[in-house]
């Protein structure tokens, strides 16, 4: 269920998550706009019928990074066939962070009740609550002058935090789902999901830092006070049906989704600059001491997005080996925006806009052996103008049309060496049109891009080399470039055709080796490589490639309990996990140690 706002996608505590699925290619027929290239589906833990258990985990590591978590699944009632099952998962995590004055605390609770109302009808009530607080969030490390070629930082200052002392990020999230499932027959079943999402997010930070001309001081600017108040309510109905079509095996997935997504934003900003500080010794100051900032939140805009969607997918067995997969999705979007501040020509009191979107996919899958297939597919997708309708301004909606895209993908999945190994290979071409990117002069604004093309190859494999040694790895190569994009540079229009978008590595690779010393002891090493990325649209700035290594050793105390020690970034590599065009260098985590104990009984 997408909440249609990227800022809401904060990392979740994995304790309440059952699994994460990569929905590749054209997932748009189920999950809506933005699915060319795939999407991630975070699936929460739910009550089930497969046995009672209790489990827990305790973790502690560098920089006081810690977690305490527990959960249980329990049948309610007495008898050989219980009708109700309950699950509860709770976790508390936190830490002081490797950056000065940065700390974080998070609570996560997930509760679900599964009730078998009849042998064929069941209902699941699922509730989730997340509460996160982060003090003095890290917004990046300033880059040394001059800005040319490879961007560099003062590595001795990698842990400095230039945010104010009372910088803050908070979020409170509540999820409710009511899931009704009915098995009509062996060939037909349906599911109805009512969902409610309520979130409040608060930001209070000083976010931009630059060195002065001789790199002796850091100039701080861009104070940002913000609150997001968001509610999403909707209902999704899904039907699965298997019935021959023209004498051929046929499986259908049909559905309807209606939602109302409303968000009110309360921004206050002051650009500054707010003076120069000595990076060797400075007082971070307090947010409300900054000129132009004062306590309290003032409404800016309320955006309401109503979405009505119909989707259908069919898998048709043309032969025993060859299948045709098709899918269609129709979306009707209604945007209603109300301005709570001063009315101007560029920011009217109220405006509306509507869109009708039809996207789809078609593909062939050939199963040439029981353990190998090859597929070819074409898909289309659409994104809202300006990127996010729940925060879109009048200018963004006026100046942008729907962002569209299409994708060709050719791939194969197969097992080898008598099942000891498995692999996936894919080659793709993605074209995106009429979308937006962050304005390099003001990351809170966006600028339009006409078209971008990406071509790439992805491969993943696992191999049981010996009964005790398992190797897993993946590799991705991509060639991404702007086809139509003109950027305003000092009042002059400059074409960026042929340039690579920032923060897009050409190559990424991962490798994991796991060895079972004996039934109780297990160890492993891992490596991750990311090639150099550009830091601006002109491709005149870049940050270097990096490789980070890790290792772990675990001991099974008994059938229920495992103790694991882990080291990340073994060589204490200093690297940029992300870079902004201001430019700011987001330094990756240093070397860290962790010890955890997990049990289940």
Regions found by a protein language model. Give the residues of each.
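Structural signature of Gram-negative outer-membrane beta-barrels, strongest in the C-terminal barrel
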Residues: 114-118, 230, 248-253, 257-261, ...
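Face-selective signature of the C-terminal outer-membrane beta-barrel domain
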Residues: 174-199, 222-339, 424, 472
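Membrane-embedded beta-barrel scaffold of Gram-negative outer-membrane proteins
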Residues: 179-185, 189-195, 199-207, 367, ...
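Gram-negative outer-membrane beta-barrel transporters
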Residues: 420, 429-431, 448-537, 571, ...
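C-terminal beta-signal and adjacent terminal beta-strands/loops
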Residues: 471, 520, 528-536, 551-601
